[in-house]
Amino acid sequence: GVDSTVSAILLKQQGFDVIGVMLKLWAEEGFNRENQCCSIEAANQAHRIATKIDIPFYLLDAVEPFYKAVVQPFISSYLSGETPNPCAWCNPLVRWKQLLLYADAMNADYVATGHYVRTIKDAEGFVHLFRGMDSQKDQSYVISRLSQDQLQRSIFPVGDYFKSQVRKISAEYHLPYSE
């Protein structure tokens, strides 16, 4: 989406070598609703935008780890009368795990996402998580379960921006979702 794309743009401006990676989390053939995070159209759009901003793009298959770590526990929790939050499980157990494995394979030092959070490393090297600058878009809750090792290797470029600023940067690059 716009937040991930602008994160890539900001990192390129800072001199990072950037690649685009999207996780395929769902295998159901009929799951192709427009503007859904895992749809074929979303993957195609991500590839087109990566090409437009001149970064390589990779689609990683994470269907099995997602099903085991998120879907099965979600179903069990729901059937037990709980109200599960799949994002809280997905980020540390699937998204970051898979992205960091791929980063290691690509000899990449960091993983960056378009989440609206901020981090600060203290003098002892401990990474502290803070709310994003835009309180309306803050996503610290869904990032809060990341391990210290995962946070050490994570960058959140849009955490210091308001959504309106992110959309303005997107518009400067004539991206399709800048409104």
Identify the function of each model-found stretch.
Residues S170:
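Rossmann-like dinucleotide/flavin-binding elements
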Residues V2-R145, I155, S164-V166:
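ATP-dependent adenylation/nucleotidyltransferase module used to activate substrates
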